[in-house]
Curated annotation (Swiss-Prot):
Keywords: Aminoacyl-tRNA synthetase, ATP-binding, Cytoplasm, Ligase, Nucleotide-binding, Protein biosynthesis. The lineage of its organism: Bacteria, Pseudomonadati, Thermodesulfobacteriota, Desulfobulbia, Desulfobulbales. It comes from Desulfotalea psychrophila (strain LSv54 / DSM 12343). Its EC number is 6.1.1.15. Belongs to the class-II aminoacyl-tRNA synthetase family. ProS type 1 subfamily. This is Proline--tRNA ligase. Consists of three domains: the N-terminal catalytic domain, the editing domain and the C-terminal anticodon-binding domain.
Amino acid sequence: MRYSQSFIPTKKETPAEAEVASHQLMLRAGFMRKLSSGVYSYLPYGLAAIRKVENIVREEMNRAGAQEMLMPMVQPADLWKETGRYEKYGPELLRFFDRNNRESCLGPTHEEVITDIVRNELSSYRDLPINLYQIQTKFRDEIRPRFGLMRGREFVMKDAYSFDVDDEQANLSYDKMFEAYKRIFTRCGLQFRPVQADSGAIGGSHSHEFMVLAKTGEDTIVVCKDCEYAANMEKAEVKLVATENDEALAELEKIETPGKRKVNAVCDFLQITPQQLVKTMVFEADGEAVAVLVRGDREVEEVKLKNLLGVADVELMDDKAVFDATGVPTGYLGPVAIPIRVVADQEVMVMKNFYVGGNEKNFHLKNVNIERDCTVSAVADLRQISTDDPCPRCGGRLELTEGIEVGHVFKLGTGYSESMNARFQDGTGDEKPFVMGCYGIGVSRVVAAAIEQNHDKDGIIFPVPLAPYTVTVLNLGLKDPEITAAAEKLYAELQAAGLSVLLDDRDERPGAKFKDADLLGIPYRLTVGKGLAKNGMVEVRRRRDGHTEEMTPEVAADFLARCIQAELTD
């Protein structure tokens, strides 16, 4: 492509609205333009990058035996009501009525639609297994869209759905997709980790997220320094370290703590550590107030709590709501004779003679012991992981790092097929529900994540597999017939070698051409300028590390073709 004929509207200044590097650089490099909050138009250069990801995804999905199809973005509400998700999904699901007063929604996922298709078309175990996928625009009405394509309302997604006869076969389908995802993100040139994850609104028994490692990632992930264990914060397990504690149970004692409400203030006043104190935090769970006990230096992981209670959502109650539910001001609440349900983190159950709120203003209790003094309805791992906690798998040290979720795979089981009465006949003639899995990749988010992981102060540094153009040829002598002829010849030879090439034939200063080449992140720059007349050489520069070589035009095309092919097959 000739730059003079291309629509790549670059910007010198960083737009004020852009907070993270990928958003800033995508706007500056002419990838996209904002239409409304969280909604963008993809310009040719940005769309080319998205198409590169799509092609890799498509090749690997087909290689894994999945078949591509396309489903409508608008979905009838009745399908979602069959599974109960129409009410559960929340305001992120955009709902509307058509002129005939039929209720519909814009699909953020397509479990209901694909299950409806399969229940009407497949009826025998002989039809299975099957895996169907699409690459399509989705819409999710995010409350606070931000970071460009990282958290937009409209996005490009690949979603696949597998149907199997039993759990054993469904596990094989899941494993096949898991391996396909590893190949996809490896081919995209990304540093990533698969992590154990909570299934969230999609549902199911088991899932993994694929996280691109980046400092600007919105998600915190937990990884072991000594083994392959990795999980997101919501799913990360805490290994309870067994400790011998022969301490005798001391007598319960009420102590005055005037005006001391916060953990640190109480600890300073009583000259104890937070590890000797248990916090009582009150959450609303489907309209019920539930007290949660965690050690004084810990925080509650809300997803773990939600899963324990079996509710759709939990929310920490404010001071007034806590007082209305318990009659105790926040900061002095404790689990002894509390009038609401109590659940406890497993760590609390092995503590002895600890401190809690006294359920009376300005008082705490000393020498509390769970089994003697409290009524606890359930115990589970409810706390957030901390750096250097022991790994639940090998006992090594855990560390926290940031990541960007680009893919998610789920074992759905029979939840959707049973609620929608989607069944097949097995080999004995019995009717059974399909065992399902679903598998998503945020295609447009992959591009943003790649930029977050690959950029510098001058612009994007595209991995070769995702670059809209792998080579840019800079003609620095438009008025010099020899330079122009050499640039044109190289442009033609590189294209003939199967490379995607941008010929910068604009009437611009050399400095402007260099800056745009760096901003756009094109992996290789081939400069044809004064060096050609001086010593018969052109300059080849690698964007990633700035490595530069001079060579003859005859050598340059073959050299670049070999370099790029090597990076595509690494």
